[in-house]
């Protein structure tokens, strides 16, 4: 029976439990990458549920095979990871620092607490569809020619070491084989058991036909099931971390008809990787669009977005290793800014003087509105005429002459 098929109530008294955020494996750019789960630590096993009344766990990890440490690479605060270098890494995050330290202490004790586990026990198990928004059904592996009987499969598994190499190499131990099972009584959904497959290189027979393994799924007696497991264990290399296994719950609920699963060859594996790359490129289109809009200073609707202070500072301050050149560049920028201000003031004066309907009243109104400009003009004349007092600057005689002429 699968370790995940246990309700939250059936676990009984837990060593530690609470709400934690778990990082999704397939999170889109705009959606939330973390989902909240009710996590329960029982002995050396860690379960997480969608809620406290769930009848089945969404995931399970056998902690003695993993290591627990803080996840400094995550941007989310109070994050930690449950890591295995050859299998998988799970990321969790707590609400605050106190809860994170509590979980690290409990999980660290559970990791060091070794339990007697069988070889065919699952290291971890997790539901494929974590979120309906981000769940994408993986294409089934292409089927090849299957063997006609279990005896042929055992012969293929017990062949010579030169001819016993598998015909497919997988990039990681996370790849799974999805068995399309037909339940006899309830007819419920298909389940997926996690199978850890060892990286290997393809090999061909002397005749020229590729050698492939066929896993036959059918109902067996207890003695036959144990013999099949022994044959499967003998076919794997000593370097494999976790052995391939099917839960007894799956095998007992299948019909007598035999469903053959064959490991795809290198060509089919490359096709699957190409499809995954295409899907990842399609998922990144929104991210590329957002970055291009951000570089062009545009909003998602196409409107012009005002530049931020950081962008203005970057565009203005461009440092050079030579300090003298930096001073000259800064002086040039200040002179350009002063020139633009003076051109603006000159344009305002020309607009006033070019007005054919200019009257004394309009000039007084313009003078009140542009008091700073007039003060700046007369302050520049002070060094040339040192006898002028500040009162004369505020009440210049030339402005009276202009008004009289008007």
UniProtKB/Swiss-Prot annotation:
InterPro entries to which the protein is assigned, alphabetical: CNKSR, PH-like_dom_sf, PH_domain
MF (Gene Ontology): protein domain specific binding
Regions of compositional bias (Polar residues) in chain numbering: 228-239, 392-406
Main location: cytoplasm
Region (Necessary for interaction with PSCD2 and to translocate to the plasma membrane): 285-406
Keyword check for Aminoacyl-tRNA synthetase: no
Pfam families per the UniProt record, alphabetical: PH (PF00169)
Cell membrane found in the keyword field: yes
Biased segments, Acidic residues type: 123-134
Biased composition range(s): Basic and acidic residues: 272-285
Alphabetized UniProt keyword annotations: Cell membrane, Cytoplasm, Membrane
Assigned GO CC terms: cytoplasm; plasma membrane
SMART domains (alphabetical): PH
Domain PH residues, every copy: 13-112
Record-linked CDD domains: PH_CNK_mammalian-like
Region (Disordered): 118-173, 228-285, 383-406
Tissue: Expressed in brain, spleen, lung, testis and kidney.
Bias (Low complexity): 144-160, 243-259
Domain of life: Eukaryota
Location in or out of the cell: Cytoplasm; Cell membrane
Function: Enhances the promotion of guanine-nucleotide exchange by PSCD2 on ARF6 in a concentration-dependent manner.
Subunit structure: Interacts with guanine-nucleotide exchange factors PSCD1, PSCD2, PSCD3 and PSCD4.
Protein's recorded name: Interactor protein for cytohesin exchange factors 1
Organism: Rattus norvegicus
Gene: Ipcef1
């Amino acid at each position: 029976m699968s370790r995940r098929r246990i309700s939250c109530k059936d676990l009984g008294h837990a060593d530690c439990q609470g709400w934690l955020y778990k990082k999704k494996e397939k999170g889109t750019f705009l959606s939330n990458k973390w989902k909240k789960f009710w996590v329960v630590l029982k002995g050396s096993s860690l379960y997480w549920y969608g809620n406290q009344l769930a009848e089945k766990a969404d995931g399970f990890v056998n902690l003695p095979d993993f290591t627990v440490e803080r996840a400094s690479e995550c941007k989310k605060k109070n994050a930690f990871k449950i890591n295995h270098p050859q299998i998988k890494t799970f990321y969790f995050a707590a609400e605050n620092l106190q809860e994170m330290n509590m979980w690290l202490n409990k999980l660290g004790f559970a990791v060091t607490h070794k339990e007697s586990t069988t070889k065919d026990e699952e290291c971890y198990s997790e539901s494929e569809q974590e979120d309906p928004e981000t769940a994408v059904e993986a294409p089934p592996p292409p089927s090849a020619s299957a063997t006609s009987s279990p005896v042929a499969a055992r012969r293929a598994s017990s062949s010579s070491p030169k001819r016993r190499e598998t015909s497919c190499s997988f990039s990681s131990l996370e790849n799974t084989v999805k068995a399309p099972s037909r339940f006899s009584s309830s007819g419920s959904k298909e389940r997926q058991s996690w199978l850890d497959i060892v990286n290997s290189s393809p090999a061909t027979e002397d005749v020229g036909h590729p050698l492939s393994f066929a896993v036959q799924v059918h109902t067996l007696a207890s003695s036959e099931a144990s013999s099949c497991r022994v044959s499967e264990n003998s076919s794997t290399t000593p370097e494999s971390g976790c052995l391939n296994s099917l839960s007894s719950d799956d095998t007992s609920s299948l019909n007598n008809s035999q469903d053959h699963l064959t490991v795809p060859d290198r060509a089919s594996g490359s096709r699957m990787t190409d499809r995954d790359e295409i899907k990842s490129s399609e998922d990144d289109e929104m991210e590329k669009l957002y970055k291009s809009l951000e570089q062009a200073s545009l909003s998602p609707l196409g409107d012009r977005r005002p530049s931020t202070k950081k962008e203005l500072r970057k565009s203005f301050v461009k440092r050079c290793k030579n300090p003298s050149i930096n001073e000259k560049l800064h002086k040039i920028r200040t002179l350009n800014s002063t020139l633009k201000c003076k051109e603006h003031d000159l344009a305002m004066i020309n607009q006033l003087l070019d007005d054919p309907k200019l009257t004394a009243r309009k000039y007084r109104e313009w003078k009140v509105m542009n008091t700073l400009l007039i003060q700046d003009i007369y302050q520049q004349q002070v060094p040339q005429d040192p006898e002028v007092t500040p009162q004369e600057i505020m009440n210049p005689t030339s402005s009276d002459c202009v008004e009289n002429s008007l």
